[in-house]
């Protein structure tokens, strides 16, 4: 048979081989399983790599396929909720223990695990493929695969260079290589941030207090968790689930924007002094109150991993008195209720104090899974049980605020209380009976959170519509408590209708993004 014709037939048989289709499907699922958007280019290029390796280095191909399939299978449920690895996901990995990890695993829909098993099964099939007895000659198809896969490797680096960036081979868009790079780079950034945090947390604060004129005897900061503003009736939600906040005399901020989309990053930027985008962990609102002569208390229902290893722990340990409902690791006992914190505040308020008091309560609030917070209870069904429980967590927090307010009124001391949430959440599996909410950074609702101030001398229920940013929280804290410090630049009166200027948030890639450029994730009230 003519050699050219024979080579043409071999090429055609390989192009239309079931294994070519198999590797294409596997490449596609690995791409999606690692959290990256579908790309026909990289799916086809990775298929070409697998075909080439099978021809030349079959054992290497099996290792690559096996490892990639295993990682993609395990990561697939997370990828659908959180996307590709970034600073936030690696930070969460560092600051989450087995208990919370187990809880997170139960929130993903069952079919995410089914797809993960399917990806793993494809990997097993690929590994078990028998080697061909006769090694075929190198042909045109092999050359095309080689040229195509190598050329694709340079696409992203060349694009970066063309768009004013730097040409780096490590920026290749191949999902497998990109995943490894994203994990390594972001993990190094997290470790560097934690080392810097530990160093600064052990240092003395650098506040220069210039005046201390508190209006009230007791100040209370209640830090909520994962509450998006449109889930609370008092802040424009469709449900009458916050009767206390909706009616109490005080200030409702209708447009308060969180600093970031996760607890550690958001509160790190909110509660600490920030210089060039980096939190100065030694200079936070607790050390400022200490420096001003306040007595400080920190009561938490979020547990404590260690003394310095999270932004919250580094702040909490600076208070004069610190108590955690959960002994030991974060969420060591997920059944502890936020309401138990009121036993601690009752003890503090029952005592007489000569100094001004700052009491901080850190809630579990609406942290996923919401049904674990409510023991499966909800009042109004909306789309899914988890969504319905999420709405009910707002009622639980509202009831806690009511009881805390009553404690403060009965104490006989003048007081002011501020409540806000660290960040919001976004809907996943929208419109399905498994709909749930998880961390995200793409939508305005991830940053739209409640913020309210209730004081003992308030005479009316008022709403402030001017937009406010959590990046200016220390400015608010200074004005609220009457503590002036040289390091705090007051840009505008926080409790006013004066405009605050453009507002930026910090996304999970640690980039500053204009809040107005974010998408929307509407809370559909349909049952």
Curated annotation (Swiss-Prot):
Pathway in which this enzyme or protein is active: Glycan metabolism; osmoregulated periplasmic glucan (OPG) biosynthesis
Query: Which Pfam families does its entry note?
Result: Sulfatase (PF00884)
Cellular component, GO annotation = plasma membrane
Q: Which GO terms describe its molecular function?
A: phosphotransferase activity, phosphate group as acceptor
> What residue ranges lie in the Periplasmic compartment?
1-33, 84-106, 168-527
Write down the InterPro entries for this protein, in alphabetical order: Alkaline_phosphatase_core_sf, PEA_transferase, Sulfatase_N
Q: What class of enzyme is it?
A: transferase
Enzyme Commission code: 2.7.-.-
Which keywords, in A-to-Z order, does the entry hold? Cell inner membrane, Cell membrane, Membrane, Transferase, Transmembrane, Transmembrane helix
Keyword Transferase among record annotations: yes
Residues on Cytoplasmic side: 55-62, 128-146
Instruction: Briefly state the protein's biological role.
Output: Catalyzes the addition of a phosphoethanolamine moiety to the osmoregulated periplasmic glucan (OPG) backbone.
The entry sums up its family as follows:
Belongs to the phosphoethanolamine transferase family.
User: Per its record, how is this protein called by name?
Assistant: Phosphoethanolamine transferase OpgE
Q: Which organism is it from?
A: Escherichia coli (strain K12)
């Amino acid at each position: 048979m003519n050699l050219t014709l024979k080579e043409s037939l071999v090429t055609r048989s390989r192009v239309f081989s079931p294994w070519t289709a198999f590797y294409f499907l596997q490449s596609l699922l690995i791409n999606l399983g690692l959290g990256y958007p579908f790309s026909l280019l990289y799916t086809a290029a990775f298929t070409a790599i697998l075909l080439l390796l099978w021809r030349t280095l079959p054992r290497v191909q099996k290792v690559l396929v096996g490892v990639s399939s295993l990682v993609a299978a395990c990561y697939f449920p997370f990828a659908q909720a959180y996307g590709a690895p970034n600073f936030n996901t690696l930070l969460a990995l560092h600051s989450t223990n087995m208990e919370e990890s187990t809880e997170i695993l139960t929130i993903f829909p069952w079919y995410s695990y089914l797809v993960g098993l399917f990806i793993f099964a494809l990997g097993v099939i690929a590994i078990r493929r028998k080697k061909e007895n006769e090694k075929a000659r190198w042909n045109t198809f092999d050359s095309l695969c080689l040229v195509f896969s190598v050329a694709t490797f340079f696409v992203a680096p060349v694009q970066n260079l063309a768009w004013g960036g730097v040409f780096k081979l490590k920026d290749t868009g191949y999902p497998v290589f990109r995943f490894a790079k994203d994990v390594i780079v972001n993990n190094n950034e997290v470790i560097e941030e934690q080392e810097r945090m530990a160093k600064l947390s052990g240092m003395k604060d650098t506040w220069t207090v210039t005046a201390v004129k508190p209006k009230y005897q007791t100040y209370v900061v209640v830090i909520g968790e994962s509450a998006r503003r449109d889930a609370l009736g008092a802040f424009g939600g469709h449900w009458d689930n916050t009767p206390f906040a909706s009616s109490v005399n005080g200030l409702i901020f209708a447009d308060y924007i969180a600093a970031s989309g996760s607890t550690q990053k958001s509160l790190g930027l909110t509660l600490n002094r920030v210089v060039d985008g980096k939190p100065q962990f030694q200079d936070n609102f607790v050390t400022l109150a200490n420096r001003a002569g306040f007595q400080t208390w920190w009561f938490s229902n979020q547990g404590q991993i260690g003394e310095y290893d999270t932004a919250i722990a580094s702040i909490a340990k600076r208070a004069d008195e610190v108590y955690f409902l959960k002994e030991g690791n974060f969420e060591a006992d997920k059944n502890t209720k936020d309401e138990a914190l009121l036993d601690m505040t009752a003890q503090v308020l029952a005592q007489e104090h000569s100094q001004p008091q700052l009491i901080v309560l850190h809630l579990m609030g609406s942290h996923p899974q919401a049904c674990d917070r409510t023991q499966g209870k909800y009042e109004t069904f909306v789309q899914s049980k988890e969504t319905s429980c999420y709405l009910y967590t707002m009622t639980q927090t509202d009831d806690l605020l009511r009881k805390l307010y009553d404690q403060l009124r009965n104490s006989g001391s003048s007081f002011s209380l501020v409540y806000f949430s660290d960040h919001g959440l976004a809907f996943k599996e929208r419109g399905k009976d498994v709909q749930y909410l998880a961390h995200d950074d793409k939508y305005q609702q991830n940053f739209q959170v409640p913020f309210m101030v209730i004081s003992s001398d308030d005479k009316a229920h008022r709403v402030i519509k001017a937009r406010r940013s959590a990046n200016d929280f220390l400015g608010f804290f200074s004005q609220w408590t009457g503590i002036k410090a040289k390091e705090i630049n007051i840009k505008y009166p926080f409790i006013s209708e004066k405009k605050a200027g453009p507002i930026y948030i910090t996304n999970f890639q640690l980039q500053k993004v204009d809040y107005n450029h974010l998408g929307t994730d509407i809370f559909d009230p349909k049952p």
